[in-house]
Amino acid sequence: YVTQTTLSVDDTKNIVDALKIKFPEIKEPVKEDICYATTNRQAAVKNIAKNCEMFFVIGSRNSSNSQRLVEVAKQSGCNRSELIHSESDLPIEKIINCKTIGISSGASAPEVLVKNFINKIKEKINLEIEEVEIIKENIIFKTPGKLN
């Protein structure tokens, strides 16, 4: 079997478990075929969202990965989870009275978008930031020149 690289890790596990029951001799991939960034972000969102009043995923509206992160946040207990494209989409009126807001980004969203989003929130409300590292990622990609 093969899986889509941006599927929900939990959904994929459920499907694979069902396949193994129905087809005990099924051949598995040699290695994990869900990308590391997807797996890591889903684990982080799952850990953080359960403690948030509101959760934002920064990413493209047509990004399967970003959409899955919103689903994971909701499944983890934060029903007020939204996908936003950039800081200009920030619904200030929704966060004014929130005590805890979670933020993550899709695997392909540049870090500068996350920083811009946080800066936009800082302009509107007093903010204490706590970075939560669930899994250390050692891979670094160069930011495209247009985004610097």
Each model region followed by its residue ranges:
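Helix-loop module immediately N-terminal to the HCX5R catalytic loop
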Residues: 88-96
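Active-site donor-nucleotide binding/catalytic segment of nucleotide-sugar enzymes
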Residues: 2-8, 104-107
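C-terminal functional extensions of proteins
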Residues: 50, 54-57, 62-63, 71-72, ...
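Glycine-rich phosphate/diphosphate-binding loop of Rossmann-like nucleotide-binding domains
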Residues: 5-23
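Glycine/threonine-rich flexible loop motifs
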Residues: 12, 66-67
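Active-site rim loops that border cofactor/substrate pockets in soluble metabolic enzymes
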Residues: 21-54, 59-61, 67-76, 80-87, ...
